[in-house]
Amino acid sequence: MKITKIEKKKRLYLIELDNDDSLYVTEDTIVRFMLSKDKVLDNDQLEDMKHFAQLSYGKNLALYFLSFQQRSNKQVADYLRKHEIEEHIIADIITQLQEEQWIDDTKLADTYIRQNQLNGDKGPQVLKQKLLQKGIASHDIDPILSQTDFTQLAQKVSQKLFDKYQEKLPPKALKDKITQALLTKGFSYDLAKHSLNHLNFDQDNQEIEDLLDKELDKQYRKLSRKYDGYTLKQRLYQALYRKGYNSDDINCKLRNYL
């Protein structure tokens, strides 16, 4: 087969052959196989060229994808599949990128966890789930998590939540709110409970009464649209009790309110 045309198309070259076949190749392919118009290729040379062309093109795609941020082996492989790179070529590209240290799942997991320690708010359980979603194996994640102390991060997150809700909730509800938020973020129950120890939940009676008055007004506006009489009173009691207010305080307020 003879090359009848070589035409540059942005980052690729269009190769046309005298058997009406055509393909796109990278500049590396042109150089490696010393391609030029009228050059004759046998079947083996053509197959070698096609293989190298896709390998070169796929690797360039992968390096472009990696130029934005670190990626896992799986993320790179999935990206190449979207660009219709063949599976055996993808395997070769992944191997090359690993050997050249462009991708390393263990380093990616370590970086992700360290960045979370500095700027994030996720506990170990959520971190592991996020990394598993990136295609990183548990055996690359677990050793790093086991060596990471999440105590200070849990305290930082709990302090932030405390500052946000302390003027909105009574002590019991505030503790429950912070604990549940930490569990949702992936911290263990023991660590969530421990993080509460450095917070001051003391509120004077007037502060609690003011919060109760405010919450009672809010719940009344909401529930009085649907209920009245005894049912309204029961609904108000239940709503306020769930918010963490003392039963005697609620009953006292309701007697004077309704």
From Swiss-Prot:
Pfam families: RecX_HTH1, RecX_HTH2, RecX_HTH3
GO biological process: regulation of DNA repair
Compartment(s): Cytoplasm
InterPro entries xrefs: RecX_HTH_1st, RecX_HTH_2nd, RecX_HTH_3rd, Regulatory_RecX, WH-like_DNA-bd_sf
Keywords: Cytoplasm
Role this protein plays: Modulates RecA activity.
Protein name: Regulatory protein RecX
Gene this protein is translated from: recX
